[in-house]
Amino acid sequence: MSKFFPSAGLVGLFLFCPSGTAAELTPHDIMYAVDQRYDGDSSISEMTMVLIDRRDRQRRRDLRIYSKDFPSASGDEDTRALSLFESPADIRGTAYLNFDWDDSERDDDSWLYLPSLQRVKRIASSDTSDSFMGSDFTYADINGIEIEWYDFSFINESELVDGVECWLIEAIPKTEFKDKAEEATGYSKMQSWISKESYLQMRGQAWELRGNRIKYFTSSEIELIDDVWTIKSLQAIT
């Protein structure tokens, strides 16, 4: 599947350079290029999630993410990712498994293991707009959203974000996919600031259907690691 991440994805984004000059690229070309980043055939990431409430109280959650690509029936790749929470003690052993199928007609398969209950909960497609482990991220923010569900347009073809020149691109569900897209994401529309140099999402915002609020995403601590542009810090605020 070709996907984009409203939140830039929890495992970071990597550089992919499409053919053609910047002037020739359409908004769809750019979002497809963001999706087609090289991230290797397998990866292991150590992450820390910090939840901050309205009283500025913080809760820290440490997790490790394992991701691996497998050959698909079409000759492309299916991706399986396992997120394993290591701390704090009350959620240690909680695991989230996602199968991202190459077949665009097939929805992701996702499961959440809750050790305190010793049960596995299947995440239905109608639940992917729910909060992921009490955070401002949803399952859809983490898994990604189908590019083909959306029409993309330029809001601004040149805008600076922290000194980085970006395209500002808006995503609105196509009429034929509107109900499915809104159910899966909980968003009526999204906007992304994409770096013209690295094709990383520097900033994003999503209009929530519930509560009529806007969710804001910000990427920071961007580093070139082993010739790969990597986002090391990602913030979501609702």
Task: List where the protein language model places each region.
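N-terminal mature ectodomain segment of secretory-pathway/periplasmic proteins
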Residues: A23-S116
